[in-house]
From Swiss-Prot:
Matching NCBIfam families: PRK13837.1
Places the protein is found: Cell membrane
Domain (Histidine kinase): residue spans on this chain: 476-698
Enzyme Commission number: 2.7.13.3
Gene name in the database record: virA
Protein name: Limited host range VirA protein
Any single Gene Ontology cellular-component annotation: plasma membrane
Pfam family, one: HisKA
C-alpha cells in the first residue's frame, strides 16, 4: 500500500499512530535502560568504605604510636602526625564522597559524620597536648635523673642517705612507670627532705626538687591525655557511620531494586503496548488496503453499468458482471441479488453471478421482507443462517451470508453470498462491505430501471409529439378532405329524393358505404391525434375477426398463407371494430412484408388469464382476464436495436417498402385506447410474434351493423332551414341536401345577410352556421339577438370563444366535418323548432 492511494484523513491517522509507536519504543528503551543501567557509583561506595577503614587503621596506629611515644620508644613525634594527617584527609574525602553520593543531607549520616569529625578533632587536640606534656615529662625526667646522679657524685653519702636520694630516684622510676598517689606522696616527702638538706649541692638539689615536682604534676596529666587518646570515640563513631552508611546503602539498594522492577515492568508494558499497537496498525492497514481494493471493486461495478444500451438484456448482463466482481472480491462461490416488490409481495428481478441461479424460497423471502419493514432502527437486516435456513430452497448448497435492506418504498433488496466452505462469522467490517457492495449494485440496477423508464417515457413523449404532428397534418388537410367527402356524400344521398329504384342506385349505395367508411377512417386518424373523441362499444371480437378474415386474405399477397385459429366462445371487448380492423390489417401487412417469397401467418384469438404481474417487451401487464389476439409469422424478424423503437411514429425497419411508419404506431395507439397491452417476441431469421392483450368486458355486445349498417333517414315537412356558408359550392350542396330531406332551405354567404333577413321580418325554424362565418372569432352576441330562441347548429370546429346565442336558452349543437347527410338529417330533425 502506498501513501498516494490514501485519503488525507487516513494519512493523518496513520501518521499519528506511527508517532505513537515511535514514542512507545523510545519510552520502552528509556525505561529498560533505567532499569538495567547503574544507579549508584560502586567506586564511590567502595571509596567511602575504604576511607572509613583507613580512619580505623590510622586511629589505631595513632594510639599505638602515642603509647610508644609515652614509653619513650619514639625519637620524634612524626609517627603521631602522619596518621593524624591521614585521618584529617580521610574526613575531607568522606565529606566529598558523601556530597558526590548525595547522602550528605541524610540526617543520621550527617550527624554521625559530624560526630566522627568532632572525635577526630578531640583526638587531634589530645595528641597535641600529649606531645607537649610528654616533652615536658621527658625533659624533666632526664634532668631529674641527671641531677640525682650529680648529687650522688658530688655530695656526702651520709647526707644523701639521710635525704634518701637513692630511694628518691628509685621511687621516681616506679612513679614514671606506674604513677599513683602513694608514690607521689612519698616522692613529695623525699623532695621536701632533700630540699631541707644543707650539706649537698644546693643547685643540684633545686634542680632535683623542681624537676621532681614537675614530673609529679605532668605525669598524671600525661597519663590522662594518653587515656583520652586511647579512649577516643573515633573508632565507635567510625563503626556507627560505617553501619549507618551500609544500612542506608542497603535500603537504597532495596528501593533501587523496586524502582528497577517497576521500570522493567513499565518497559515490558510498553513493549506489549507496542506489540498491540503494531498489531492494530497492521489490522488497520489491512482494512485500509481492503477498503482500497473495495473502492476498486466499486469502480469496476460502475464500469459494468456504463453500457450505453438500456435493454433488459443489457441490465441483466451488467448486473451479473457486477455480482461476479463482488463474488471474486469476497472469495465466494456464488453471488445473487433479488429485488422484492413490497406492494405485490413478489420478486421483481433476480440476478446471479454464477450459473445455475438458485431458486428462491418465497415464504422465507416474505419473512425477511417483513423483518426489514418492521425494523424501527434501520432498514438493514443481517443474517448468517445455517445451511437449511437461508432464503433459498434446498437445491442451493453451501452456507449463505445474507443482507437485506430497503432500496425504496416499493423495493427491498436481498443480497446473498454462498460459501461452499464453512467459514467463521464475518467481521463487522466485512458485513459493512457486503452492505455497501449490495447497495451499490442495487443502486445501479434501480438507476438503470429508472433510465429505462425514462427512455420509455421519452419514447412515449416523442410518440405523442409525432402523433401531434400527425394531428396537425390531419387537421391541415381535414377541411379540404372533409369538403370533398361532404360533396360526395351529399350528392350520393340525393338518391333518397328518387322514389323509384334504378339500376344506378346500387352503385350509389356503394358510394355511400365507402364514403362512410372513409369518414370513419378520418375519425380514427383524428382520434389517434386526440382531435376527436373515439367511439367505443362492446362487441364480439371473435365474430369480428371471422367477418374480417376474408378481406385480409384478399388484401395480402397470394404467396403468403394466412391461418386463423379462433375459439368459438364469445370474447367481448370494448372498443371500435374499425380499430380492430386496422390492427389486423397493419399487423398482417407487416408480417407479409417480412416474409421473403412464400410465408405463413398465423392469427389466433383466445382467452388468456394472467395469474401474476408479467413483464412484457413494451411495459408490464397486471394480473387479470384478457382476450389474446396473436399474430405470428416466419419472416426475417426484427433486430434488437430496432425493437425498442418499432411503435414510434414514422419509424420504419424496411425503407425500401415505401411504408409511412404509422402502422405499428396506430396499432399501439388503438391497443392503448382499448386499455390493452402489446408484447413482441422476435428472433432474427426465425420470425416475429405480436401478442395483444385486451381486457374482457361483461357488457352485452352490440351488432357490428350499429357501426356501419344503414338506417332510415328522417325527413322534414317544409320547415325553413337557414344556412350560413361562405363557400358558394358548399352552400349549394347544403341547400340541395336540405331540400332533399323535405325542408325549405334559405342560404346566406355571410352572417350579416342572415341577420338582415331576420330583421326584414323573416323567420327560420333552425339555423346552420359554418364556423368560418365568424371573422377572427369575434363575438356576435349582438347579431344573434334577433334570432331569439331559434336553434343554432355550428358546422366545423368548436370555437369556445364564439357565443352563438343571445340568451343561452336556444339549443346549440356542433357538427364536425365532414358532415354526412344522415348525420345532418338526424341533427336537424332532433333540434328543429316545431312550435
Amino acid at each position: 500500500m502506498t501513501w498516494d492511494r490514501l485519503l488525507p484523513s487516513r494519512k493523518f491517522l496513520l501518521a499519528i499512530n506511527s508517532w505513537y509507536v515511535l514514542a512507545l519504543v523510545v519510552a520502552a528503551i528509556s525505561f529498560a535502560v533505567l532499569a538495567i543501567g547503574p544507579w549508584k557509583n560502586e567506586k564511590s561506595i567502595e571509596a567511602i568504605l575504604t576511607e572509613l577503614q583507613s580512619i580505623d587503621v590510622d586511629c589505631a596506629l595513632l594510639q599505638r604510636n602515642v603509647l610508644r611515644a609515652h614509653a619513650g620508644l619514639l625519637r620524634n613525634y612524626r609517627p603521631l602526625m602522619v596518621p593524624l594527617g591521614r585521618v584529617r584527609s580521610s574526613i575531607a574525602n568522606l565529606q566529598q564522597l558523601f556530597k558526590k553520593a548525595r547522602v550528605e543531607d541524610v540526617g543520621e549520616l550527617s550527624e554521625l559524620l559530624a560526630r566522627l569529625k568532632s572525635s577526630i578533632n578531640t583526638t587531634d587536640a589530645a595528641v597535641a597536648s600529649f606531645g607537649a606534656q610528654n616533652v615536658v615529662f621527658e625533659d624533666s625526667l632526664a634532668t631529674f635523673n641527671q641531677s640525682i646522679s650529680s648529687l650522688l657524685r658530688t655530695s656526702d653519702s651520709r647526707d644523701l642517705n639521710a635525704a634518701k636520694v637513692p630511694e628518691l630516684g628509685y621511687l621516681m622510676l616506679q612513679f614514671s612507670f606506674r604513677p599513683n598517689t602513694e608514690l607521689a606522696l612519698q616522692i613529695t616527702q623525699s623532695l621536701d627532705q632533700l630540699q631541707m638538706s644543707t650539706n649537698a649541692d644546693k643547685v643540684a638539689i633545686q634542680e632535683v626538687v623542681r624537676n621532681g615536682r614537675v614530673i609529679l604534676g605532668v605525669l598524671p596529666r600525661l597519663n590522662e591525655t594518653v587515656k583520652l587518646v586511647q579512649a577516643s570515640g573515633t573508632f565507635e563513631n567510625t563503626k556507627k557511620l560505617q553501619r549507618a552508611y551500609l544500612e542506608a546503602d542497603s535500603l537504597a539498594r532495596v528501593v533501587e531494586q523496586r524502582v528497577r522492577t517497576f521500570l522493567g515492568a513499565v518497559s515490558v508494558f510498553f513493549c506489549f503496548g507496542i506489540v498491540i499497537l503494531v498489531h492494530k496498525l497492521r489490522r488497520r492497514t489491512d482494512r485500509l488496503a481492503r477498503r482500497l481494493d473495495f473502492e476498486e471493486v466499486i469502480k469496476k461495478i460502475g464500469v459494468c453499468f456504463e453500457d450505453s444500451t438500456e435493454t433488459k438484456q443489457s441490465l441483466k448482463s451488467s448486473a451479473e458482471a457486477a455480482l461476479g466482481t463482488i463474488e471474486n472480491f469476497f472469495e465466494a462461490n456464488q453471488c445473487v441479488l433479488g429485488l422484492v416488490n413490497v406492494t405485490e409481495n413478489e420478486i421483481a428481478e433476480t440476478f446471479s453471478a454464477s450459473a445455475p441461479p438458485p431458486s428462491w424460497n418465497e415464504r422465507r423471502i416474505r419473512k425477511i421482507v417483513s423483518l426489514v419493514q418492521a425494523d424501527e432502527h434501520g432498514s438493514i437486516f443481517r443474517d448468517y443462517p445455517a445451511r437449511k435456513a437461508s432464503c433459498f430452497n434446498e437445491d442451493a448448497p453451501g452456507r449463505w451470508a445474507l443482507v437485506a435492506f430497503k432500496v425504496s418504498d416499493r423495493l427491498v433488496a436481498v443480497f446473498g453470498l454462498r460459501f461452499d466452505r464453512d467459514p467463521v462469522q464475518p467481521a463487522s467490517s466485512e458485513v459493512q462491505l457486503m452492505e455497501l457492495a449490495a447497495g451499490c449494485v442495487s443502486h445501479y440496477v434501480v438507476i438503470r430501471c429508472k433510465q429505462t423508464q425514462r427512455d420509455i417515457l421519452e419514447r412515449r413523449l416523442k410518440h405523442a409529439e409525432r402523433l401531434e404532428a400527425v394531428g396537425t397534418l390531419a387537421g391541415g388537410i381535414a377541411h379540404e378532405f372533409n369538403n370533398i367527402l361532404g360533396v360526395i356524400l351529399g350528392y350520393a344521398m340525393a338518391q333518397n329524393i328518387l322514389h323509384r329504384r334504378t339500376y344506378a342506385r346500387h352503385y350509389i349505395d356503394r358510394i355511400n358505404a365507402e364514403s362512410n367508411r372513409a369518414r370513419l377512417i378520418i375519425d380514427q386518424i383524428l382520434a389517434l391525434s386526440r382531435r376527436r373523441e373515439r367511439t367505443a362499444r362492446p362487441f364480439n371480437l371473435s365474430a369480428l375477426v371471422r367477418e374480417i378474415a376474408p378481406s385480409l386474405r384478399v388484401a395480402l399477397p397470394s404467396e403468403v398463407e394466412v391461418d386463423f385459429n379462433i375459439q368459438s366462445a364469445q370474447m367481448i371487448v370494448e372498443g371500435n371494430p374499425l380499430e380492430i380492423e386496422q390492427i389486423l390489417m397493419n399487423l398482417c401487412k407487416n408480417a407479409a412484408e417480412a416474409c421473403i417469397g412464400t410465408g405463413r401467418i398465423e392469427d389466433s384469438v383466445y382467452r388468456s388469464f394472467v395469474w401474476k404481474h408479467k413483464v412484457l417487451a413494451n411495459g408490464t401487464i397486471p394480473a387479470g382476464d384478457y382476450i389474446l389476439l396473436s399474430f405470428e409469422d416466419n419472416g426475417g424478424g426484427i433486430g434488437q436495436a430496432a425493437l425498442p423503437h418499432i411503435f414510434e411514429p414514422f419509424f420504419r425497419t424496411r425503407a425500401q417498402c415505401g411504408g409511412t411508419g404509422l402502422g405499428l404506431s396506430t396499432v399501439h395507439g388503438h391497443v392503448s385506447a382499448m386499455a390493452g397491452f402489446v408484447d413482441v417476441i422476435s428472433t432474427v431469421g426465425r420470425g416475429t410474434r405480436f401478442d395483444i392483450y385486451l381486457p374482457t368486458s361483461a357488457k352485452k355486445p352490440v351488432n357490428s351493423e350499429s357501426f356501419f349498417g344503414p338506417e332510415k333517414i328522417p325527413l322534414g315537412s317544409g320547415e325553413i332551414v337557414a344556412v350560413v356558408e361562405p363557400d358558394p359550392v358548399t352552400l349549394e350542396r347544403y341547400e340541395e341536401t336540405i331540400a332533399a330531406f323535405g325542408y325549405e332551405p334559405v342560404g346566406f354567404n355571410t352572417f350579416k345577410g342572415l341577420t338582415d333577413w331576420v330583421l326584414a321580418g323573416k323567420e327560420a325554424d333552425i339555423v346552420l352556421i359554418d364556423h368560418s362565418s365568424f371573422l377572427d372569432g369575434e363575438r356576435v352576441g349582438s347579431w344573434v339577438a334577433t334570432l331569439e330562441k331559434v336553434p343554432i347548429i355550428m358546422i366545423g370546429q368548436h370555437q369556445k370563444n364564439v357565443s352563438i346565442s343571445a340568451d343561452g336558452e336556444a339549443s346549440n349543437h356542433f357538427l364536425q366535418k365532414p358532415v354526412s347527410s344522415k348525420a345532418l338529417a338526424y341533427v336537424v330533425r332532433a333540434n328543429i323548432r316545431t312550435e
